Design a protein with these regions (language model features):
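ATP-dependent adenylation/nucleotidyltransferase module used to activate substrates
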Residues: 1-160, 171, 180, 187
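AMP-forming adenylation/ATP pyrophosphatase catalytic core
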Residues: 127-134, 138-139, 143-359
Length: 359
């Protein structure tokens, strides 16, 4: 019996997962590649299937797997993705929030379904091209999620959902590397995607028009409504409250003599409140659906650094436990446009303490 540890490489067709696969093969793991088929293009008003990326991406992943001489499969998770990622994406927008579907995909697809798939094939680990690090705390035995060594590429914010079991069975071989080094390896090995651009968009909304996607997907039409000022006075008409997010300035179509920003939405009455930028700042948020990583649970107030959006620098804050598994985060300084549906992630240095969804 072969006791060599086995690794399932989640291959997107991009250079990062390609080099991750190469590094795991070089390290002596029994490797298998897999690309997720997540939805049908009919969901986008197109024909055919779509994977987590594009048909070309699947071809690239398959070509790399062939070059590395590792087995490769495309796995079909369209039903699960429709329910757990697309469904939540639409529900969050319709409830007035702004979702982060990449986090939900990590939670329910890449590190849940793929780990099940790996175990079903006698493999020990799921491997991705994410920029983050995993270590075990020698004192507590807990598995820790840490920032990437090169923080300009760090993706720990979207990985806070990983459980202890998932962290124990996940490898991030790129966590201590920078992008130029990764491309250099890909070029040296002659991989077809060595110079391929990084993907930026939500995979199932490639044109960025998420409202158009929602209307095609649901068959709904999101009607026009009123813009209100902070005193409740009608100041204009909008094109559907789902189109706007907290802090937005561009695309409002309002000429009120001074810049205004989206400050709030009432989805029941289909109104969008706008006001001066000063209305966007607050020190406090409440979050739920929390996943703790470096600690088992929060039992007393804790000093942390917190970020409430992906591109934000962490800010000093205190986190307080509330009833029903909720937490309150109080920032030392007011923060701009804290947005329902987004994630708040807590850090202690380069270690992720935990994270949850802003309510």
């Amino acid at each position: 019996m072969d006791n060599t540890p086995g690794a399932l490489i989640a291959m997107s067709g991009g250079v990062d997962s390609t080099v991750a696969a190469y590094l795991m093969k070089q390290a002596g793991y029994r490797c298998m590649g897999a690309t997720m088929r997540l939805y049908q293009n009919e969901d986008l008003g197109q024909s055919g299937f779509h994977t987590c990326c594009s048909a070309k991406d699947v071809e690239d992943a398959a070509e790399v797997a062939f070059q590395l001489d590792i087995p490769f499969e495309v796995v079909n998770y369209t039903e699960e993705f429709r329910e757990k990622v697309i469904g939540k994406f639409i529900a969050t927008y319709e409830a007035g929030g702004t979702p982060n579907p990449c986090i939900d995909c990590n939670r329910t697809m890449k590190f849940d379904k793929m780990l099940d798939f790996a175990r079903g094939h006698g493999l020990d680990y799921v491997v991705t091209g994410h920029y983050a690090r995993i270590e075990q705390d020698p004192e507590t035995g807990r598995w820790l999620l840490k920032k990437a060594l090169y923080t300009d590429k760090d993706q720990s914010y979207v990985l806070y959902v990983l459980t202890q079991d998932q962290l124990a069975h996940t490898k991030f071989p790129l966590g201590s590397m920078d992008k130029p080094s990764i491309r250099k390896i890909a070029e040296a090995q002659g991989f077809c995607n060595a110079r391929k651009h990084d993907s930026q968009d939500i995979c199932f909304v490639p044109d960025g028009d998420y409202v158009g996607f929602m209307e095609r997907y649901t068959g709904k039409y999101y009607p026009d409504g009123d813009f209100l000022d902070v005193n409740g006075k009608v100041v204009g008409r909008h094109h559907g409250a789902v189109r706007y997010t907290c802090g937005q300035r561009k695309g409002l179509g309002l000429a009120l003599g001074a810049p205004v920003y989206v400050c709030g939405k009432d989805m029941e009455h289909n109104t969008v409140t706008v006001g001066p930028e000063s209305e966007l700042f607050t020190t406090t948020l409440v979050a739920g659906d929390f996943n703790w990583i470096s600690i088992p649970e929060l039992t007393e107030p804790m000093r942390v650094k917190a970020k409430a959006r992906y591109r934000q620098t962490e800010q000093p804050a205190t986190v307080y436990p509330l009833d029903s598994g909720l937490v309150k985060v109080v920032f030392d300084e007011p923060q701009r446009a804290i947005t329902r549906g987004q994630a708040v992630v807590l850090y202690d240095g380069d270690v992720v303490v935990g994270g949850g969804t802003i309510l």
